[in-house]
């Protein structure tokens, strides 16, 4: 009964944990790190084909993004998550694969001009579609037996539609240990979704620490602030452009705008048009509608009881096709445009910025975190000119950033969640935070509750039955890592993605051979002949 820490150790992204218990091998989360890491991430200790199943906390790519790669390497087991997470993961994994393939096409055009070999993507759209077929939904609060000695239950983490903390009971040789994986713990009083549920007990807690060193401060009243910005922008004859993450934040903005329209807080512009210009955001908005009953909070549920959809309203226009998107900027009516990506580095938002940044009448409103090096960060930093589609664009529009909008609990919220445990856990492992933040929050857990807490590095292995470390690693700094390889699944690698895929296929074949032990001799003989025929063809 052991737990191995792989991703999001002293890092914020790439969550992944490997467990062995009750004769099974499985992962909790299988996330992609979209940017360069500070420390090396250890590989999954076994071939993907030997994993029995995967548990997922929520649909964000830093928790699910390597699932298609796991499939490409031979994994074919079930992947358990909440029903809403199944729906969101479906569209987000397809979207991620599409972006990867589009990037590969662009890179290969450059490579061919330079006489270089084609870049081969780590996985294909077929792999993404294949892994989506493995997704299985388990509702909140149902304690489910996955196999002898392994039970799970999902609690609402309040971070994203369908997000969960995972209670995991492991039994071996008559000894049962309960693990609690926090997932990403949500901020309180977010629109639409419930606040985080508070756990009661666990022997071991694996806990996020994204904002473990800070407070969000007093929460502004966003509705009157947003109404004021809309009023002033439309009065000038401009457009309000809102770069927004397609899943979660876009739906929050629709919730606020519905209230603004219902309360008639914007005057003189009737049912002013609001465009959601992102196919992914449109699909996500439909998923929010389909999962109202199990995921919406009491305020949203009260609106539904009155026959009011919390995120739909007169004047809302959902743009899906490229032609529909282009038409938005040829319509001179002052409007609100919500589009992805939230940091302005990709997607249709770049077209809307090109058409509006130069206009003094328009406003660009940022409602999410802007990472260093992104176009969004440059704009909130006061850039006077930016490059879009190889053109220099002057920044004359009003640039505004909403403070305090976060889907993550701050230090106070994290402590409230951890402090809800009725008995002191044997250990708390702090992950999913920047290097120093994980250490700060581990110390805070000791100071506040006398919880024995520590922040493990990737590769650390812990014996859950004996409550002791099997291997305790230190962080190995990465000198230089490019964005291109930062998101790859950590497996034993030759450095050639195509050859690694072949090796993974061979490992899967060995797993399938082992599982056929005890089969009918006639079938085993046929299987052996097929393998030998394949070997004869390729043995050169």
Question: What annotation goes with each model-predicted range?
Answer:
Residues 1-55, 60, 64, 71-252, ...:
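His/Asp/Glu-rich metal-coordinating catalytic cores
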Residues 20-22, 43, 168-171, 196-199, ...:
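Short, solvent-exposed amphipathic alpha-helical segments in soluble enzyme
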Residues 191-206, 292-299, 370-396:
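Short, compositionally biased "basic patch" segments
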Residues 459-526:
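Charged, amphipathic alpha-helical linkers/stalks
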